[in-house]
Amino acid sequence: MKVCSFLPAATNMIYEMGLERYLNGVTFECPSDKPKVVRTRLEGRNLSSAEIETFVTESSNMGKSLYYVDMELLSEIAPDLVFTQDVCDVCQISTSVVQRAIGSLEKQPKMVPLIPRRLRDVYQNALTIAKELGEEKIGLDYLASLHKRVRAITDKLREHQAEPKRVMVMEWLDPIYNCGHWIPDQISLAGGVDMLSNPAGYSVVTPWEKVQQYDPEVLVIAPCGFQVERSIKEIDQLTSKPGWSELTAVKNKAVYLADADYFTTPSTTLVDGIELLAALFHPQLFEIPETCMKKVVPISDTELSWV
């Protein structure tokens, strides 16, 4: 069976389950040496957060997709199965674009759209992938290992009767976006509550005044698609805002930059994200996982690096 994964989350889970032998094509974002079938019009553009927001908005208004398929490569692969998504046309290539692309192929592959809204949907997607590849047992074992890691966190929070922290996870810097979809589930399991979030829904522009009024105890900044190194370059867009130093999170030195993959890629990295958040929300109970050490930075550390 020849498989193409048109979203990094599916690619990640396929690799995590040890099923990469089925993969024949992936996206430009996938950490894989497989042929890159899906590309984006943003490749090679060194744009700021505000410029990306403008580009995305203008493309949407003109009915243009941010992504396209390398049809020559896809025809050469002639996949039997294609995993795609139907959650966010900004984050990944949409099902409608994929449908048009595969419609011109001589051999029509089976298309399996993955539609995660909450964390439980992400788990179900892993099982769907395993079943489609004829490897259900591997999928079940994989899920059991993820659930075990999450239970270790929730059990410890319950044991110590830890009070939920008032937090905010920010998905974009300019303009500021709150978090949505499965991220509020991650926050809850890690011992926090984000009253600015939009569970199971899209993240939306959130006025700075609203953030000030909410006054989070812990602030985690993880712009979609950005790694810490990229976010550091634009963090002054927040730190220069009026009233920044008055936020409780700032006073408590509880503001962090983190890689977006821990929150915006609906795969096993979400469990890594839960473990990371638990350590940021309740440092007296949890330590930052060793695998996350280089992918999360306290704002105070970034400020020192500018001196």
Model-derived regions, located:
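N-terminal ligand-binding lobe of clamshell/alpha-beta domains
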Residues: 1-307
